[in-house]
Amino acid sequence: MYKSEKLYYRKAFFMAMIMGVILFLPFVLIDGGYFIYYGDYNAQQIPFYTLCNQAIKNGSFMWSWQTDIGANFIGSYSFYTLGSPFFWLSMPFPAEFAKYLMAPLLVLKISCCSLFAFAYIRRFVRKLQSALIGGLLYAFSGFSMYNVFFNHFHEAMVVFPLMLIALEETVVNKRRVFFALTVALNAFVNYFFFIGECIFLVIYFLCRLTDPKFKITVKTFLVLAFESVIGVALAGAMFVPAILTCIDTPRSSNTLNGWNLVFHNPAQRYGLIFQSLFFPADIPARQNFFPDSSARWASVSAYLPLFSMAGVISFIKYKKKHWAKWLMPICLLFALIPVLNSSFVLFNNNYYTRWFYMPILVACFMTAYALENSEIDMKYGLKWCGFAVVLISMVGILPSEVSKDIVDIGTGDTTTTKVTELFQLPNEKLPFWISVVLAITAIIVCYILVRNKAKLRTNKFLQKSYCFTMVACLCFSYYTLIYGRAIGPKVGDYNNIVNATIELDDDSFYRVETYGVTNNANMLWGMYGFRSFHSILPGSAFEYYSGMGFSRSVNTDPDGSYYAMRSVNSTKYLVIQSYKLEYSDTKTLLENLKNFEKIDEQDGFTIFKNKAYI
C-alpha cells in the first residue's frame, strides 16, 4: 500500500470521528456528560451495558437473575452486547461509568463504518477521494442515524463491509482464510444480522458473476463453501446459544401465510419504502408520511445525505453492463415482496427492513462511482429524485377526515362531527414539512454541485463534493437526533433515575418493581426486577407468564390487577418517583396494589413494601 493511500485510510477514519464528535458533543453537554436519547436506547442500551459489565466482573455470566425472572446470560445478551467488540472496550471501566461511554463508542462505531466502507468502495473506483465520500455516506446514512435508537445495530454495519472485501479477495486475488475470519466475525458480532447477510451475500455473489473479472472456478467455490462452514464454527460459542435461545421465544415461530406472502399489509408500507429512499429518516415510532404502515420499529430508512438516489439512478442509466446495475433493482424487489423481504429474518412475520444497510453500502459505491465519472450525468438521477420528492410530498396536502367539535350558539351544546380537511394527513406536521424542505434543499444543492461537473477537473470537483457531503451529513444527522431527543425525557429527569441511590437494608432475596421510571431501572441500581423490557428470554419465562394469564411480547409490564403475580415473583418493594404519585395511572396502580404500604422516601423516590411478599 502506498504512503498516500494510507493517508486516505486515516482520513476516512478520523474525519468521520471529528464529525461524530461535532454531532454528539452538544447533546452530551446538554445532558450532563452523557448522551441521552429516547425509547429503547434509554431503556435498553445503557441498562444492558451496565448489567453486563457487572455480571462479567462478578462471574455471573451463565445465568442472569437481574433479567426478568431469570435468563440465560449468553443467549439473552449476545444480540445486544456480548458479541460487540465495542462493548468489550467498555469493560476496563467501572460498570457505573458505562453511561458516559455510550457517546464515545457511537463516535467510534461511525468512524469504523466510514473506514471499512471506504476500504470496500476503493476497490471499484479510480479516485480515493470519491471512496472517502462513499464512506461518509455509509457512516451517516439515514439507516445509521435511524438506528442510534437501536445502538447495537451499528456493530453489523461496521463489520459487514469486511465480509464483502473478503469475498472479493477470495475470488479475485485467491486469498485464503480471510473470508472464514470475516464470516466468524459477523456471526459472532450479531447472529440476527448475520442471517440476513447470508441472504444478501448470495444475491451479491450472483450479481458479481456477471462481471468477467469475477471469475469463479469449482475450486474457488469449494473454498468459499468450506471457509463459510469454518467461519460459523469459529463463532459457535456465541452463535449456537444465541440461536437456541432465540428460536425458543414465541415470536420466532410466527411466519407469513396467504396473501401476506405476496402483498404488504398495510399497503402504506409500499409508500414508506419509497419514502425511505428520497427523504431523511423518520425516527422509530414516528411514521409521519405513512402513519398506518405498522412499521414503527422496522428500520425502514435508506436515505443518503445530499445525493439521495441520484447517483444510483444515474449509475443504472449510464452503466448498463455493470454488475451493480442488477443488484439494486433486485434488492428493491425483495423489499416490495413480503416473502422475499422476510427471508432476511428467516421468514418471520414481524416486518423488518433491518437489512437495508447492505444495499446502502453498494448504493454508496454507486454514488461515489457516479461522482468521479464524467460519462455519468447525475442531473438525470436528480430529475427522478425531484419527481419522487414532489409526488410523495403530496401526502401532506391530501384531504383527510378529522373530528371537529361544533358548538350550537343558541343552546351551547357541543356535537362532534366528521369533516374533510387538507393538510391533516401527516402524523406530526412540523417534522413532516421539515423533512420535505430538507429533501428539496438537498436536491437543489446537489444540482448546484453537479451542474458544472464536466467543466471542473475531477480532483477539484471531488474535493468540492467531499466538503458538501460533510456538511450535508451533519445537517441531516442533526435533524434525526434533535427530533429523537426532543421527544425523549426532560433534561435532568433521566439523570436523576440513573444516578439515584436507593438503599434497601434487606438481606433476603427480593425483587423490586419500578414504576413511572425508565424500563430496566433495576439494572442501573444493581437490583433484581419485576418489570423488564427485553426481547430475548428463555421459552420457559413465556410459558410461566402465559400460565399466570399474562401475555408477554417484549415487555413484562402487568397492570395492578396482577397483584398476586407480584407476590409469587418475590416482589417485595415498589419504587416510584415521588412527583409522579399524583398521576392518575400511578393512583390506579396503588389502588390495585393494596398490599403495598409506604415505608420510605429516598433521593426523590417513594418506596412501598409488599406485605404479602413470598
Question: Which residue stretches match the model-derived regions?
Answer:
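Membrane-interface coil-to-helix junctions
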Residues: 19-114, 136-158, 246-251, 259-303, ...
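Contiguous transmembrane helix-bundle modules in multi-pass membrane proteins
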Residues: 174, 193, 323-497
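Transmembrane alpha-helical segments
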Residues: 113-120, 159-171, 199-207, 308-313, ...
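Periplasmic/ER-lumenal interhelical loops and adjacent helix-loop junctions
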Residues: 43, 47-52, 78, 85, ...
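Membrane-interface helix-loop-helix junctions at transmembrane boundaries of multi-pass membrane enzymes
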Residues: 214-222, 311-335, 456
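Soluble catalytic regions of membrane-associated enzymes that act on cell-envelope
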Residues: 91-92, 428-430, 462-614
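Membrane-embedded helix bundles of polyisoprenyl
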Residues: 16-20, 110-123, 129-210, 223-243, ...
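Start-transfer (signal-anchor) and selected internal transmembrane alpha helices
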Residues: 1-28, 223, 460-468
